[in-house]
Amino acid sequence: YGGPLTVDDLPIDQHQFIALVAPRPIFISGGEYIEGNGVPGTNSRYSLENWQDTPGTFMATAGASPVWKLLGRKPLANKALGLSFDNVPDPVAVKARMPSPLTPLIDGDIAFRQHDQGHVDAPNWPTFIEFAGHYFKSPGFKN
């Protein structure tokens, strides 16, 4: 080994972890980068909320999306915008196609939405409820 193992020693990437959920529905969310006082001990101008790496989260979500199609389910998509991630994506192209914050991609069985309020979940709850309503038919959900 030559030293302690780190995350860099893992022979996997996040899209592979996400793909393990397929073909079950999954909703992945994150917040937008927020300008802040910086990360202590660095020259970063972004606040601590930015450690979540929403662009990387989106790239991992899009990278896992083809597995849903392979298993006969709907890939990551927003039909109104003409966005669909049903092929093995090129990471650079995926990052370029990342939708602006507050744009839900909930037309597939794998879903993503970025809100504009940093590292919290509450702003994405209404979109999650709408996504979950595609699968749960009860009075509390819009169908």
Sequence positions of predicted segments:
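Catalytic active-site module of serine/aspartate enzymes centered on a nucleophile-bearing elbow/loop
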Residues: 113, 123-143
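Histidine-bearing beta->alpha loop at or near hydrolase active sites
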Residues: 77-122
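Short, proline-enriched alpha-helix->beta-strand connector loops that line the catalytic pocket
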Residues: 20-26, 105-110
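Mobile cap/lid helix-loop segments that gate and shape the active-site cleft of serine hydrolases
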Residues: 1-17, 47-93
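Short, well-ordered loop/turn and helix-capping segments at boundaries between secondary-structure elements
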Residues: 23, 32, 63-74, 134-138
